[in-house]
Amino acid sequence: MKTLLKNRELSAFFAIVALFVVLVALNPAYFILQTLAMIFASSQILCLLALGATLVMLTRNIDVSVGSTVGLCAIAVGVALNYGYGLATAIAFALAIGALAGAFNGLLVVGLRIPAIVATLGTLGLYRGVMLLWTGGKWIEGLPDSLKSLSEPAFIGVSPLGWLVLALLLAGGWLLSRTAFGRDFYAVGDNLAAARQLGVAVNRTRMLAFTLNGMLAACAGIVFAAQIGFVPNQTGSGLEMKAIAACVLGGISLLGGTGTLLGAFLGAFFLTQIDTVLVLFRLPAWWNDFIAGLVLLGVLVLDGRLRQALARHQRALKYSRFQPGNKGSKQVARFPERKSKEVA
């Protein structure tokens, strides 16, 4: 129990394995590598958003505008390609749009000191409005095969975009755990005042978190356009809540300073796995959000109970050392008794 609480990635991993076992038990035909590859392909958008949300949440902030950023950047890459620009130029354009959107969120939170939830709720509507004004409410269609080919299975059934997601996960995980740059994110979220005293560039770190989050949302928009082949005017709606839920499932604390990119990745994979299982068993689509929310609540309640039990256990161990008769207790020498003088 103690190991699971300290390594929340294990909890998410065991949940993924358990759900896969249930899936195979109900239908052994799904016990193939292709099933995992299909779930991973479906999870790539949410995985990218969860990675970006982790950076922001580590600094004790939150961004609920990433769904609109995904739609805006998917529109950007689609418009650029339809205007005849090359694939590399269109991708760079979308990444720049995402970085600007994230940096603007950071400016509102860091520069103007607007609470993150309020600022990003505002930009949620703003970016969605810009997207609709840009396209006139129309869909972007006729995307070239050069973009679609990026989402087609390649080496061991994983697409080039899938390998990009894994590369970002590995690189980001290494940066956060092995470099001073990554440790700054944890320091800012864990104790803001202490981070300032230690010389951490707090404002720069928070700005970077929002900017990188915007760029990862842009990557998600590019993946969406490549996988679907067109861009509807409601692209990205509701994804911000799923990204936050994936982070919480993976052990990212809403209070900042705790969690890993691997945990967020596994949380996103698990939520997508639930959707995929429902599709494979032909259950109505409206069950997806209900079951995902139910699972999230169940995990949070179980996690809270386990943490309380662990805290009680640790307190009991702490105070048991001072119980008389314990081998580990410290023996306190008694004062010698004074002999009373008899008065004649």
Curated annotation (Swiss-Prot):
The keyword Membrane applies. The chain crosses the membrane at residues 13-33, 38-58, 69-89, 90-110, 114-134, 155-175, 212-232, 251-271, 283-303. Keywords: Cell inner membrane, Cell membrane, Membrane, Transmembrane, Transmembrane helix, Transport. One of its GO terms (molecular function) is transmembrane transporter activity. Residues 335-344 have a biased composition (Basic and acidic residues). It holds the Pfam family BPD_transp_2. Residues 323-344 are annotated as: Disordered. InterPro entries: ABC_transp_permease. It comes from the Bacteria. It is found in: Cell inner membrane. Its main location: membrane. One of its GO terms (cellular component) is plasma membrane. It is a multi-pass membrane protein. Part of the ABC transporter complex LsrABCD involved in autoinducer 2 (AI-2) import. Probably responsible for the translocation of the substrate across the membrane. The complex is composed of two ATP-binding proteins (LsrA), two transmembrane proteins (LsrC and LsrD) and a solute-binding protein (LsrB). Belongs to the binding-protein-dependent transport system permease family. AraH/RbsC subfamily. This is Autoinducer 2 import system permease protein LsrC. The gene is lsrC.
